[in-house]
Amino acid sequence: MGICMSMYTQVLVPVDADGDHHILWSRFYERWGSCFNPCAGLVNCLPPHSSALYLCHRMEARSRAPRRQLCPPGITWLALAYLLSCLLASSKAKVFSRCELAKEMHDFGLDGYRGYNLADWVCLAYYTSGFNTNAVDHEADGSTNNGIFQISSRRWCRTLASNGPNLCRIYCTDLLNNDLKDSIVCAMKIVQEPLGLGYWEAWRHHCQGRDLSDWVDGCDF
């Protein structure tokens, strides 16, 4: 059983043969659930073929018609969650100093991991992101490179637009905050690939085979 709130609406309708218009007061109903006919008030004061009555019934039918849902509920919540994570990530972004980043990497055990010393990792981070945890680079195919190591959404992390394997099992926005844990754990997984740090073009072009001691010189661990 529905609940109705009545109201009166002013309706301008042609009621004379000469085309004159009269103002009629018709009682309408705004309905919630199952309720009365909202056009009932016009039925008693207009001819059966009145254009105003016809329009009223059309509006009533439209109001009762089910509305098309633009997005499935799951997609809507996913979009909201992704947007929220983007906002949170941007609020926690940080640009590290050289020694500050070297210490973080040292504490996470990157020095010597898979045969690469700490300077390799610091050099990589500089030439990929400039030590900026919030760095995002957009590729022509729609994929993104994310965070301090510019980890690609093609294979390693997930965005709303990507259908990649997400091998690190994280959202790409998780790589954009000043807590480096997700970025480092994912990078450690990437470096297990046959190319090692050679997976990153920046490391091959700027760091590989060079004296990198300056990257950690003067840093206190």
UniProtKB/Swiss-Prot annotation:
The keyword Secreted applies. It comes from Mus musculus. It comes from the Eukaryota. PROSITE patterns: GLYCOSYL_HYDROL_F22_1 (PS00128), GLYCOSYL_HYDROL_F22_2 (PS51348). Interacts with ASTL. InterPro entries: Glyco_hydro_22, Glyco_hydro_22_CS, Glyco_hydro_22_lys, Lysozyme-like_dom_sf. SUPFAM superfamilies: Lysozyme-like (SSF53955). Residues 1-69 are cytoplasmic. This is Sperm acrosome membrane-associated protein 3. GO terms for biological process: fusion of sperm to egg plasma membrane involved in single fertilization; sperm-egg recognition. Gene3D superfamilies: 1.10.530.10. Residues 91-221 are extracellular. Sperm surface membrane protein that may be involved in sperm-egg plasma membrane adhesion and fusion during fertilization. It could be a potential receptor for the egg oligosaccharide residue N-acetylglucosamine, which is present in the extracellular matrix over the egg plasma membrane. The processed form has no detectable bacteriolytic activity in vitro. Its main location: membrane. It is a single-pass type II membrane protein. GO terms for molecular function: lysozyme activity. Residues 94-221 form the C-type lysozyme domain. Keywords: Cytoplasmic vesicle, Disulfide bond, Membrane, Secreted, Signal-anchor, Transmembrane, Transmembrane helix. GO terms for cellular component: acrosomal matrix; acrosomal membrane; acrosomal vesicle; extracellular region; secretory granule. The record marks A93, K94 as: Cleavage. Disulfide bonds join C99-C219, C123-C207, C157-C172, C168-C186. The keyword Transmembrane helix applies. The processed form is expressed in sperm (at protein level). Expressed strongly in testis and epididymis and weakly in pancreas. Belongs to the glycosyl hydrolase 22 family. The chain crosses the membrane at residues 70-90. It is found in: Cytoplasmic vesicle, Secretory vesicle, Acrosome membrane.
